[in-house]
């Protein structure tokens, strides 16, 4: 598996396995174990997904040394604020059954964000978290929060695919040496994306499927991707992208597909109200 280097010199696998919306108590365990067997070594979960325990069990039962697996999790809004965040980090570690987490993110940009960030910084300095990062942060939100941060985020996980290329955000993140990480890299099954003429023609040329062309393009853009699937053949296919390379002209053709229309706007007050109301524990 190819890797990228983060701004703290830690390496991260270029393609990770996402477990968003896969249920706990069995399905996430099975999917994670299958992904590890397929060759993934980067698993992306979150407190808000309510499946950290299944991820932890699968990693333990895989027989693969913990040092070879990169675990990402995220703090949910309910546990923002300095003291709550410290407890939330410990809860994630307990559910995952680990004594450190490779990458821990603030999942959404609301509430007592900087209080939670301070707790992440302290956990990072203590070695409980190897890298810390942000998620769903726009340029405006970055400008709002950045001056309250002592440790620079290693990653910003956002919606990213050929239709949502985040060009302004990528420029600002690059200026701060923050690596972009893609959720919905395949557009959450968007037929318009997967059946796009440019992508389909490249798939035919390289004897790949549309998803593999997209994931290869994301890799060549220097962005980490987190495809999700419970289908074992598709899992394998999503990391079978390192035996070909898109040309400069093909990269430009993919870049021309940008619509700049994300599925939701993190700056929308209605989005903030909805997410702040979601509770994951008593």
Cite the ranges covered by each PLM segment.
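N-terminal binding-site loop/beta-alpha segment at the start of enzyme catalytic domains
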Residues: 1-69, 186, 280-282
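Acidic-and-aromatic substrate-binding clefts and catalytic sites of carbohydrate-active enzymes
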Residues: 22-26, 44-54, 78-83, 109-114, ...
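Short, acidic/polar
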Residues: 23-36, 81-96, 115, 140-142, ...
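A structural motif
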Residues: 40, 98-101, 129, 153
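CE4/NodB-like, metal-dependent polysaccharide N-deacetylase domain
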Residues: 85-105, 122-126
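Beta/alpha (TIM)-barrel catalytic core signal, keyed to glycine-rich beta->alpha loops juxtaposed to Asp/Glu
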Residues: 108-282
């Amino acid at each position: 598996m190819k890797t990228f280097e983060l701004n703290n010199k830690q390496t991260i696998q270029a393609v990770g396995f996402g477990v968003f919306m896969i249920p706990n108590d069995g399905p996430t365990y099975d999917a994670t174990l299958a992904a590890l067997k397929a060759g993934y070594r980067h698993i992306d979960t979150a407190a808000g997904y309510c499946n950290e325990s299944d991820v932890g069990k699968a990693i333990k039962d895989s027989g693969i040394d913990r040092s070879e697996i990169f675990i990402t999790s995220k703090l949910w809004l309910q546990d923002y604020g300095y003291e709550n965040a410290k407890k939330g980090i410990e809860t994630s570690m307990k559910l995952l059954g680990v004594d450190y987490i490779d990458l821990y993110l603030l999942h959404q940009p609301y509430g007592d964000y900087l209080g939670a960030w301070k707790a992440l910084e302290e956990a990072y300095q203590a070695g409980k978290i190897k890298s810390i990062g942000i998620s769903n942060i726009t340029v405006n939100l970055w400008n709002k929060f950045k001056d309250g941060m002592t440790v620079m985020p290693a990653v910003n996980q956002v919606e990213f695919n050929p239709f949502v290329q985040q060009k302004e955000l990528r420029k600002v993140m690059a200026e701060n040496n923050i690596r972009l990480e893609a959720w919905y890299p395949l557009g959450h099954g968007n037929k318009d994306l997967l059946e796009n003429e440019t992508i389909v023609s490249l798939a035919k040329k390289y004897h790949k499927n549309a998803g593999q062309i997209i994931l290869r393009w994301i890799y060549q853009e220097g962005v980490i991707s987190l495809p999700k699937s419970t289908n074992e053949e598709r899992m394998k296919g999503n990391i079978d992208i390192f035996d070909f390379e898109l040309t400069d002209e093909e990269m430009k053709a993919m870049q021309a597909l940008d619509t700049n229309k994300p599925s939701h706007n993190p700056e929308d007050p209605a989005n903030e109200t909805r997410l702040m109301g979601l509770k994951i524990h008593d």
